[in-house]
Regions:
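Long, contiguous, compositionally biased segments that the model treats as domain-scale units
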Residues: 2-8, 19
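A structural signal for well-ordered alpha-helical scaffolds and beta->alpha junctions
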Residues: 8, 12, 152-153
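Intrinsically disordered, low-complexity, positively charged segments
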Residues: 12-38
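Residue-level signal for secondary-structure boundary elements
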Residues: 23, 27, 96-100, 167, ...
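Conserved donor-binding loop and adjoining core beta-sheet/short helix segment
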Residues: 28-110
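Short acidic (Asp/Glu) patches
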Residues: 87-88, 117-121
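Acyltransferase donor/substrate-recognition loop-hinge adjacent to the catalytic core
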Residues: 119-193
Length: 194
C-alpha cells in the first residue's frame, strides 16, 4: 500500500532530488507547482524506494496517477526498467486496493517510450490538449494583440480600472517587505488558494 499525504514544505528536498534524477523539465513536476496546486487538483504524494509518486483527484472520485519522479527516463538499462516495473506494480496495487481506475496523466514522450519498453502493448495513450503545457510568444504577451488574447486584454483592462493607482516596480531590497505584505494580503483574501 502506498502511504499518500498532502504535500508540505517538509517534502521539498526529497521532491527536488527526485525531480533532478528524472531531469524533469515540465512545470507540473516542479515542487512549487505541486505544492501551490495541491488543493486545486487534489494532489497527494508519497515517497518510496527513492521515488516520489503523485496522485491527482481532478474531480471527486476521478483519480490519475503519474509515473514517479526519481527514475531517469532516458535510461533504458535493465535495472531502470525493473525499477519502473516495480513502481507501476505498486501503483496498480494501490488502484486495485482503492477501487480506482488505473490511469496515468502527464506522460511525456520520454516516459511513454520507457513505459512502452517495460510494458509492450499494455497501455493505450491518448493526448489531451487540456493537460498540455502552453507557451506564449513573449511579443504577443507584451502587446496582448489578436483575437486569441481578447480575454487577457479584458482582464488587464478590468484590473487597471479597479486599481487605478497600480504601478510596475522591480522587486529589490528596498521594496521586498512591501511585496511580501501584498502577497500575504492577497493570499488571505483568497483563502490560501493561488
Amino acid at each position: 500500500m502506498i502511504d499518500w499525504h498532502i504535500p508540505t514544505l517538509h517534502d521539498f528536498e526529497a521532491a527536488q532530488k527526485a525531480a533532478e534524477i528524472s531531469h524533469s523539465m515540465i512545470n507540473d513536476e516542479a515542487f512549487s507547482t505541486i505544492f501551490l496546486y495541491r488543493k486545486k487538483f487534489g494532489i497527494m504524494i508519497a515517497f518510496r524506494d527513492g521515488l516520489m509518486f503523485r496522485l491527482y483527484e481532478l474531480e471527486p472520485e476521478n483519480f490519475y496517477y503519474t509515473l514517479p519522479l526519481g527514475l531517469d527516463y532516458s535510461d533504458s538499462s535493465m535495472e531502470n526498467l525493473e525499477r519502473l516495473k516495480d513502481a507501476v506494480a505498486a501503483l496498480k496495487s494501490d488502484a486495485d486496493a482503492n477501487r480506482r481506475r488505473f490511469k496515468f496523466i502527464l506522460i511525456t514522450d520520454d516516459k511513454k517510450a520507457l513505459l512502452e519498453q517495460a510494458f509492450p502493448l499494455r497501455f493505450t495513450f491518448t493526448e489531451n490538449p487540456d493537460f498540455s503545457d502552453y507557451v506564449y510568444n513573449a511579443q504577443s504577451m507584451a502587446n496582448l494583440a489578436g483575437k486569441k488574447l481578447q480575454k487577457k486584454r479584458n482582464h488587464v483592462s478590468h484590473f487597471m480600472k479597479t486599481y487605478s493607482d497600480v504601478r510596475f516596480e522591480l522587486i529589490n531590497e528596498h521594496n521586498t517587505a512591501d511585496a511580501l505584505k501584498i502577497e500575504d494580503q492577497w493570499f488571505s483574501e483568497n483563502n490560501g488558494e493561488f
